[in-house]
Amino acid sequence: EEGWVAHEAQQVKSRKWSADHAKHLIRFRHQDLAMNDFGVGDSFPEMLLINCHNGLGSYQLRAGLYRMVCSNGMIIADAEYGSVKQRHIGFDADSVIQSSRQVIEDASTLSNVVSDWESISLTPEQSREYIKRAAEVRFGDNVDRNILANLNRSRRNEDMGDSMWKTFNRAQEGLMRGGFVNGTTNRNARAITNINTNLQINTDLWAMTSEFAQAVKN
């Protein structure tokens, strides 16, 4: 009734918890938040519903972005979305509905953030520094040239450019999809499929990018 439609679901495979009690992540799209209305070109907001693995009915609502060009989901981590990004609620329909409405209200603010990142052009030096910090979000100190090159690689024409937004998108997709060799460990970086790791990397990357963008502007 609120206009949200589930379009993707993910479940943690665990020997400890049954399927009913395992952690789930469900991504919802809203019929009123189309790309044209949102105004961020190839992306639009989503709502993520995450349950805790204890099976006690505790849930978490977070804001996300879905980028159509690469079918890739991002997770927002910004103080401006504190009322939505990590709200713990009981299994109560009214609480879920009220929180979901906040996602819609914050969509225009989120659009402004993305537009701001689109307007920031990075110098080659700034781009290298950002990619290094992005790599550290997943790999820590185990970062080599091959990782940096792959995180800054344009996988399609839409990814090309020196804006903060384009650079962020390249790094985010590379971190999540992997598919390259980590030269410091000689092991292949696999795609991220674990829900907790997905949340952590996306959250940390968004927060780091927000700080980096602010520093560049200053």
What spans do the regions from the language model cover?
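Intrinsically disordered, low-complexity regions enriched in serine/threonine
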Residues: 13-16, 27-218
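N-terminal "first-domain core" detector
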Residues: 1-24
